[in-house]
Amino acid sequence: MCGGDVQGQGVASGCDEALERADSLRASDPVPVESGEGSVPGEHSQELETGASEETLRERVNVLQEQYLRKAADLENYRKRALRERQEAVEHAYAALLADIVAVLDDFDRAIEAADHASSTEVEASSAFREGVLMIRKQLSSVLETKYGLEYYPVLGERFDPNLHEALSMSPSASVHEKIVGAELQKGYRVRNRILRHAKVMVLTPEEQTEPDRGDGPSE
C-alpha cells in the first residue's frame, strides 16, 4: 500500500508514477458499446437520404414506364391509321378504274341484247357474234371479280332499297303491297360490299286503296 510512514520520499514518488500509469491504461481501454448504440454520427441521416433516393428513383422509373407505354400505344395507333388510309386510297383508285370498266361491260350487254333481237336472216351470224361477245364478257367479269372484288347484284323482284337502287320511274300495280323493283334499267355493281354504282330501276308501287263515295245516306 502506497503512502506509509516508514517509506521514504522515493517510494512516494514511485506510487505516484504507478497511479498515473494505471490512469493512462484505463483511458486507453476501449469502452464496450451496446448493440444499437454508439453509431457513427451522421450514419442514420445518410441511411434516410439513401432510402429517399431509392423512392425517388422508383417514382421516376414508373413515370418513364407510363410514358413509354403511351408512346408505344400512339405509335401503334398511327401505324394502323396509316395502313387504313393507304388501303382506302388504293380502294378509291380501284373504284375509279372499275367505274370506267363497268361502262365497257354495259357495252357488252348491249351488244348481246342486240344479237338476241337480230332478224331471222341474221340469226346464224348474230348467234356466233353473240357467243363471242358473251365469252369475252364472262372472262372480263371473272377477272374483275377475282382480283378486284367487283360483283353484280341482281335486283329484279327485290324490295326497293334506296341504298342499292336508283328509281328512274314508278308504276302503280295491284300485284304488290310494297315498293318492288319491277324492271332493271341498268345493272348495279359493288366492290367488296361497297356500292360502286347503284342499279337503275323501275319501281312498282301499291295502288292507292280508296273507299267508294257512299254519299250522305239513303234519300227519303
Curated annotation (Swiss-Prot):
GO CC aspect terms: cytoplasm
SUPFAM superfamilies: Coiled-coil domain of nucleotide exchange factor GrpE, Head domain of nucleotide exchange factor GrpE
PROSITE patterns membership: GRPE (PS01071)
One Gene Ontology term from the biological process aspect of the record: protein folding
Pfam families in the cross-refs: GrpE (PF01025)
Compartments it resides in: Cytoplasm
Region listing for Disordered, in residue ranges: 1-55
Gene3D superfamilies: 3.90.20.20, Head domain of nucleotide exchange factor GrpE
Molecular function terms from GO: adenyl-nucleotide exchange factor activity; protein homodimerization activity; protein-folding chaperone binding; unfolded protein binding
Keyword Methyltransferase in record: no
Keywords: Chaperone, Cytoplasm, Stress response
UniProt subunit comment: Homodimer.
Function: Participates actively in the response to hyperosmotic and heat shock by preventing the aggregation of stress-denatured proteins, in association with DnaK and GrpE. It is the nucleotide exchange factor for DnaK and may function as a thermosensor. Unfolded proteins bind initially to DnaJ; upon interaction with the DnaJ-bound protein, DnaK hydrolyzes its bound ATP, resulting in the formation of a stable complex. GrpE releases ADP from DnaK; ATP binding to DnaK triggers the release of the substrate protein, thus completing the reaction cycle.
Family: Belongs to the GrpE family.
PANTHER family: GRPE PROTEIN, GRPE PROTEIN HOMOLOG, MITOCHONDRIAL
Protein name: Protein GrpE
Organism name: Treponema pallidum (strain Nichols)
Lineage, broadest ranks: Bacteria, Pseudomonadati, Spirochaetota, Spirochaetia, Spirochaetales
